[in-house]
Amino acid sequence: MKIEKITGREILDSRGNPTVEVDVVLESGIMGRASVPSGASTGEHEALELRDGDKHRYGGKGVQKAVENVNKVIAPHLIGMSALDQIGIDHAMLALDGTKTKAKLGANAILGVSLAVAKAAANYLDIPLYRYIGGTNTYVLPVPMMNIINGGSHSDAPIAFQEFMIRPVGASSFKEGLRMGAEVFHALKKVLKDRGLSTAVGDEGGFAPNLEGTEDALNSILAAIKAAGYEPGKDVMIGMDCASSEFYHDGIYDYTKFEGEKGKKRTADEQIDYLEKLINEYPIDSIEDGMSENDWEGWKKLTQRIGDRCQLVGDDLFVTNVDFLAKGIEKGCANSILIKVNQIGSLTETLNAIEMAHRHGYTTVTSHRSGETEDATIADIAVATNSGQIKTGSLSRSDRMAKYNQLLRIEEELGDRAVYGYKRIVVKG
């Protein structure tokens, strides 16, 4: 099970931007391959994604430096190590980098190797990746949080909030939940078409129509849920990603950045009032990044106000980092953490963040990025950690479907042991 060869290469992601792919080959000839996702809206404390900066090549977004770090720096250091020593390998790469944000080697280089090693090890043992990562107590299939309307940085629509998601909580299995989501997605397409609105899809496969604002988006989703034959608030709940850091400046939540002149400018208290109003009026049970990553006081107030009846997910706030999560736990900010492997940059650190969250009663949501590949590792991570929730886009684009289809396979493999995740989730007040 010793590592014999590590090869990094530059491939393209779902947005046509370069990203890193890594092959790890063991002495036995068994291989693991992983590719790395990339975000559009990024938290300022995320691990560094190393880009070349050469404007004459892919507009500066090339990843040849990161690939070179895989092939010339990381590979010689890891060859000969056991692929089964995931923690040892990840720690060796962190020591080799030596920076807090992985700025020297690049989180994209380190993560590619980290995930490829795990896949090679699982293949060597001839067990599924979710079983290798999570052990025998892995049987919870996640509730999908499907981003069916895009706003903010993910579209050109005049809506400040970045994502409007459906959560098929009333399903009895992942397979049924996926079907419900697909039916609502197609019903929404008709709702939008009937209004003469665009049904082109954004980065994550959701629609990005020229709606009039947040309430218009929510009402359109309600209409689609009903048109698909489901009951909002019972069969299907709604989740939002406000991505508030994107329009927070000098203590003000400035909606005009995305909504133009009709957009409001809200103080932290007014932002909290507005979010509370929305969950009172709509079947919303999950809000991500409702406050800015730098507004810890606002986060604390929001959690005190609505944390007992709504999942409050920290994405930019926590960046999958145990240091920021520990601060949030101590201050009473949020009650859930979004898990993005490339925010922190190694499998070991990702699992550490999930473990800390669960230990302190926080829920976890395993998540994709807006720039994805056909790699479905996050589906296995969601099951491996009994996360109970996954965010991996809408019901279109094969880079998103790859994850959903992998979850269908896992559920089939688990058979009667499979539990659909929402039953396991208790929102912490």
From Swiss-Prot:
List, alphabetically, the Pfam families matched.
Enolase_C, Enolase_N
- GO CC annotations? cell surface; extracellular region; phosphopyruvate hydratase complex
> Which InterPro entries would you find in this protein's record?
Enolase, Enolase-like_C_sf, Enolase-like_N, Enolase_C, Enolase_CS, Enolase_N
Q: Where is the active site?
A: 204 (proton donor), 340 (proton acceptor)
Which positions bind Mg(2+)?
241, 288, 315
Q: What is its EC number?
A: 4.2.1.11
According to the UniProt entry, its GO molecular function terms are: magnesium ion binding; phosphopyruvate hydratase activity
CDD domains of this UniProt entry? enolase (cd03313)
What cofactor does its activity depend on?
Mg(2+)
Positions of (2R)-2-phosphoglycerate binding = 162, 340, 369-370, 391
Xref: SUPFAM superfamilies:
Enolase C-terminal domain-like (SSF51604), Enolase N-terminal domain-like (SSF54826)
Highest taxon of the source?
Bacteria
Q: How is the cofactor bound?
A: Binds a second Mg(2+) ion via substrate during catalysis.
Compartment(s) where it occurs, according to its Swiss-Prot or TrEMBL record: Cytoplasm; Secreted; Cell surface
**Is-annotated flag, keyword ATP-binding?**
no
- Keyword vocabulary terms for this entry: Cytoplasm, Glycolysis, Lyase, Magnesium, Metal-binding, Secreted
> What are the BP-aspect GO terms?
glycolytic process
**HAMAP family cross-referenced by the UniProt entry:** Enolase (MF_00318)
In which family does this protein belong, per the annotation? Answer: Belongs to the enolase family.
Name recorded for this polypeptide: Enolase
Species in which this protein is naturally found: Bacteroides fragilis (strain ATCC 25285 / DSM 2151 / CCUG 4856 / JCM 11019 / LMG 10263 / NCTC 9343 / Onslow / VPI 2553 / EN-2)
Q: Source taxonomy lineage?
A: Bacteria, Pseudomonadati, Bacteroidota, Bacteroidia, Bacteroidales
Q: Which gene encodes it?
A: eno
